[in-house]
Amino acid sequence: GQFQVYFQPKYRIRDDHLAGAEALARWTHPQWGMLSPAEFIPLFEKNGFITKLDQFVWEEVCRKLKAWEKRGYSDFPVSVNVSRADIYSVDIADLLISIVQKYELAPERLHLEITESAYTENSKQLIEVVSRLRELGFIIEIDDFGSGYSSLNMLNQMPIDVLKLDMKFIQSETAKPLERGILQFVIDLARRMRLSVVAEG
């Protein structure tokens, strides 16, 4: 097909150990060639195709995880994107659990990335959905943390496992002492809350 799933590795910084991967969709367009998510995801969010794309990615990732498991890599997690449209779908929990059960995988092998901006749309419903997903065993990651919105308030209310820092937030860290201090504060806060931290870039 025109869509493929690529895996971007995640490394543990203290020992450079491969700790997992992030699944990213790529579109090989017949006219325009290889397109990155930034070039087509906004369009898919508008026309509703994003839910079909996400489900395709989830299925492909679970299929790959099962193949890796058979080769002895049973503790290798993969992060997948969950769009705002998916989050507010009434059957997302049932759909995700059915996919991991189909491939006989533990839910914690699938890390679900939810953007920080999703919190501002309907925080009450989002918290309910995320709580249900965590109860089922999925690992919840907040993507693009620090990109704005009510970051600290969200941390106080959202049942999450991982903070994924926004790239702009990290890049600006090198510019000014104040920004470095803010970054260190966020990392220290995450540690106190027993959250893992992922830095993009």
What is the predicted function of each stretch?
Residues 38-42, 51, 127, 131, ...:
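Conserved long alpha-helical elements within nucleotide-processing catalytic cores of c-di-GMP signaling
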Residues 2, 48-49:
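Catalytic-site/binding-pocket detector for metal-dependent nucleotidyl cyclases
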Residues 97-173, 185-201:
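The catalytic core of metal-dependent phosphodiesterases that act on cyclic dinucleotides
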Residues 13-22, 49-126, 200-201:
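Catalytic core of bacterial c-di-GMP phosphodiesterases, primarily the EAL and HD-GYP domains
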Residues 19, 36, 91-93, 122-126, ...:
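Residues at alpha-helix caps and immediate loop-helix transition turns in enzyme cores, especially N-
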Residues 1-43, 81, 142, 199:
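Active-site core of bacterial EAL-family cyclic-dinucleotide phosphodiesterase domains
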Residues 53-56, 179-185:
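Conserved acetyl-CoA-binding loop-helix of GNAT-fold acetyltransferases
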